[in-house]
Amino acid sequence: MIHLVLLSGGSGTRLWPLSNSTRSKQFLKVLRDADGNHVSMVQRVFGQIGSVDADIDITVATCSSQQESIRRQVEGGYALVLEPERRDTAPAIMLACASLALEQGAGTDDTVIVMPIDSYADQAYYDSVVRLDEAVQSDFAELVLMGVQPTYPSGTYGYIVPATGEGWP
């Protein structure tokens, strides 16, 4: 079985002044769906995942300040795991996995896929995400890291930006 964990805990201030510490970017309806309706990143991601596998088990790891925004934008069909306080990515993943194992009945042979709730990728990316289970279950891999080709280096996304100057290439 596949368990998809969507991470939604950041403050999402990259679109300031539209987004800020109380109104994260993933909830802003700045995108358009196939029908031309305004949707948020959260709604777009849920729609893309649902079009590939409507029955996939989804858990959203978030903080208490975002739970109502998520509930307003996406109706049911997922579990919410609330972080007691923001501690960044690794603790959020561990908390979600603990919830999957201890509260939601995930088995040791299940596949857990973790991704941000505000990813912006084309449909082919989401088609590939749900196929990761095939790689894991066939013993091709036990850990898979999947991403998109960056268009430029940016320190704000966690890329390493080398220094320049004397002694540096």
Question: Which residue stretches match the model-derived regions?
Answer:
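Proteins with a high burden of low-complexity, intrinsically disordered sequence enriched in S/T/G/P/A and R
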Residues: W16, G167-P169
